[in-house]
Regions:
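N-terminal secretory signal peptides that target proteins for export/translocation
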Residues: 1-11
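Bacterial N-terminal signal peptides
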Residues: 14-26
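Substrate-gating cap/lid region and adjacent catalytic-acid/histidine neighborhood
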Residues: 286-454, 465, 472
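Surface-exposed patches in mature extracellular/periplasmic domains of secreted proteins
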Residues: 219-221, 278-286, 415-417, 477-484
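Serine-hydrolase-like catalytic core of hydrolytic proteins
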Residues: 100-284, 313-343, 408-411, 503
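Short, solvent-exposed turn/loop segments enriched in Gly/Ser/Thr/Pro and often Arg
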Residues: 171-174, 224-228, 417-424, 481-487
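Non-catalytic accessory segments of hydrolases
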Residues: 30-194, 444-462, 470-482, 500, ...
Length: 527
């Protein structure tokens, strides 16, 4: 009997210990959960995560609009439905629906239509004073890529300079840019095709309404972006719906281009609908019934602004030319080499002749392909003639012209050129500056490299310039060389050199870009 009692006692003791451990563990988990930062915003409470080492906090996967699915596919972003309780904000959400083009295979595999989310990175928790806000728009040709879920844009390094970082996703391809007469008719604004831009404005409106709860200053918002993101923010600078929502802009490798008239965009949308086998009547109901995969297989839609009389009532490039863009400071630039046309010199000559027409002889001489058999000029910074043409026509010269026209309107402009190749690559490429801007110099990932001390110093300088600009509207400040404003006489710009140094230079590709500007202005006059 005594033995049985001892055994029972031991069992009870072990059970008590296990129960105590379980309760202690549960309490510890609850305490850990409760230590995570919680914020109340317009739609409800959200709980983020503290960053290691007291580096601040991050709130991931915050919806800034209702999911644009079902009847909300191809509609303006709608306000978020409020929720009860505390919403977990510990994970970024997948990118917006897209087809794979190889470079974005990972993003395409994870993508979905329910994608209107953003991440917020805070440099302090709790916040002690309002901080400048930087909202990032990713690149990808407006057909691919990711914002918040891309580790390249991890924000710990950038926010250490005292800014709040917001990374937003927006609809892409056919989901973001399809115009169609039926969509225009159902719109209260008689508009269609600009859904991606409306998403970006909705994200900015969310920042305006909620960012103070995360320690951000809604009166000091900088939009910055690269490639398509840079083009988009430049276009937003020409929309009346953007006024008051952002106060500075950083455009990396992208400028405002031409917009498509609504009627032309609608016709393109009807062709897309036909490809998807939509009926001539009630095509919209049919298109909304299709799966995401069906739409991705059968259609692309446009990739740029539509002149709808609501979001855009004038061609964006013409708005800059008329000095009517948002009256805000602009920091703009491109990479020495962006995207190269791999064709032959003879093919390049034909391309230049078709693009520049009467101005072609001048351009052909500059690129060294004036006559059949010419191999073209090789530049130690800008590469061969195809490298030069690809960057000049697509990125560099449009950006220089946009900066010049914005400066002529009396607004402060700073221009740059980024030359540094990610080691051990031989040359800089399109998007090659991103690892430096975000301070994510890593041996793995989409911008992996064998980074050294020169790269770390260059990244630190770029981050200071970018965040100084976000704080004051001027990139200059303690610890970095003076960066002169752009002016039409000397055309000074900051060059981030191949060696990783900082150098002020003048007249960036002036002769080449003057030909571009002359051709562009003539084209505007004929539109």
């Amino acid at each position: 009997m005594l033995k049985i009692e001892i055994v029972e006692f031991r069992r009870a003791a072990v059970l008590a210990i296990l129960t105590g451990c379980f309760l202690f563990g549960a309490a510890a988990l609850a305490a850990a959960a409760n230590s995570n930062p919680t914020v109340s915003i317009a739609a409800g409470q959200v709980q983020g995560r503290l960053l290691p080492g007291g580096a601040g906090a991050v709130f991931r996967g915050l919806p800034f609009a209702q999911p644009p699915v079902g009847p909300l596919r191809w509609r303006e972003p709608q306000p978020v439905t409020p929720w009860k309780g505390v919403r977990d904000a510990g994970e970024s959400r997948p990118p917006c629906a897209q087809n794979s083009s190889g470079w974005n295979a990972k993003e395409a595999a994870a993508s979905r239509e329910d994608c209107l989310h953003l991440d917020v990175w805070m440099p302090q928790w709790p916040s002690k004073s309002p901080k400048p806000v930087m909202l990032w728009l990713h690149g990808g040709g407006n057909t691919g890529g990711a914002g918040a879920s891309d580790p390249l844009y991890e924000g710990t390094s950038l926010i250490s300079h005292g800014v709040v970082l917001v990374i937003a996703d927006y609809r892409l391809g056919i989901f973001g840019f399809l115009a169609h007469p039926e969509l225009t008719r159902e719109s209260p604004h008689h508009s269609s095709g600009n859904y991606a831009f409306l998403d970006q404005i909705a994200a900015l409106q969310w920042v305006h309404d909620n960012i103070a709860q995360f320690g951000g200053d809604p009166r000091n918002v900088t939009v910055f972006g690269q490639s398509a993101g840079s083009m988009d923010l430049s276009v937003l600078m020409t929309s009346p719906l953007s006024r008051g929502l952002f106060h500075r802009a950083i455009a990396e490798s992208g400028a405002a281009g031409r917009a498509t008239p609504l009627a032309d965009a609608e016709q393109a949308g009807q062709r897309t609908a036909g490809t998807l086998k939509a009926p001539a009547e009630e095509a919209l109901a049919y298109l909304r019934s299709l799966s995401t995969a069906d739409l991705l297989r059968g259609g692309r839609g446009g990739t740029g602004a539509v002149l709808d009389g609501y979001l855009f009532d004038s061609d964006p490039s013409a708005v800059f030319a008329a000095s009517k863009a948002l009256p805000i400071p602009l920091l703009i630039g491109s990479n020495a080499i962006e995207m190269s046309d791999a064709g032959s010199p003879d093919a390049l000559r034909a391309t230049i002749q078709a693009r520049y027409r009467d101005l072609a002889p001048k351009a052909l001489a500059l690129y060294g392909v004036a006559s059949p058999g010419d191999k073209g000029s090789i530049d130690p910074v800008y590469g061969g003639p195809n490298d030069q043409w690809g960057a000049d026509i697509g990125f560099r010269c449009p950006g220089i012209l946009q900066g010049e026209e914005h400066a002529a309107a009396g607004f402060p402009v700073w221009e740059y050129q980024f030359d540094r190749a990610i080691p051990p690559k031989p040359n800089v490429v399109h998007s090659g500056e991103l690892a430096y801007v975000f301070g994510n110099l890593r041996p793995t990932g989409s911008q992996a490299g064998e980074f050294g001390e020169a790269d770390r110093k260059l990244s630190a300088a770029i981050q200071k310039y970018w965040t100084n600009f976000a704080k004051t509207g001027d990139p200059n400040g303690a610890g970095v060389p003076n960066w002169p404003k752009y002016d039409a006489t000397s055309r000074k710009f900051m060059e981030f050199t191949r060696a990783g140094e900082l150098a002020v230079n003048e007249n960036q590709r002036r002769a080449f870009c003057e030909v571009f500007a002359e051709a562009e202005k003539a084209s505007r006059a004929n539109r």
